[in-house]
From Swiss-Prot:
GO terms for cellular component: cytosolic large ribosomal subunit. One of its GO terms (biological process) is translation. This is Large ribosomal subunit protein bL19. It comes from Pseudomonas putida (strain ATCC 47054 / DSM 6125 / CFBP 8728 / NCIMB 11950 / KT2440). The keyword Coiled coil does not apply. NCBIfam families: rplS_bact (TIGR01024).
């Protein structure tokens, strides 16, 4: 009985429209940032290196290079802190987890664009 109630509550919270994306895709995540009294949106653009599909507990990791330093951020897919998610380009990769990109730099870390 409680399992059905939990599933119903999770389904209500998962009502947000999320575009389909996969590891290797370049995405722009608009994150709500609260600084004192005021709130603003902060864009985080990078390559999705991992995706975890667990219903309401789904998450994805985005990696970008900011002034020569690699920055990774993990987002909860259905978090209220995420305002919007946009896919900028589709990447053509053969693995589900792209952790090997952490060791690569420059042109070696590029990902081919998916043609179709």
């Amino acid at each position: 009985m409680t399992n059905k109630i939990i599933q119903q509550l999770e389904a209500e919270q998962m009502s947000k429209e999320i575009p389909t994306f996969a590891p290797g895709d370049t995405v722009v995540v608009q994150v709500k940032v609260k600084e004192g009294e005021r709130s603003r949106l902060q864009a985080f653009e990078g390559v999705v290196i991992a995706k975890r599909n667990r219903g309401l507990n789904s998450a994805f990791t985005v990696r970008k290079i900011s002034s020569g330093v690699g920055v990774e951020r993990t987002f909860q897919t259905y978090s209220p802190q995420i305002d919007s998610l946009a896919v900028k380009r589709r990447g053509d990769v053969r693995k589900a987890k792209l952790y090997y990109l952490r060791d690569l730099s420059g042109k070696a870390a590029r990902i081919k664009e998916k043609l179709s």
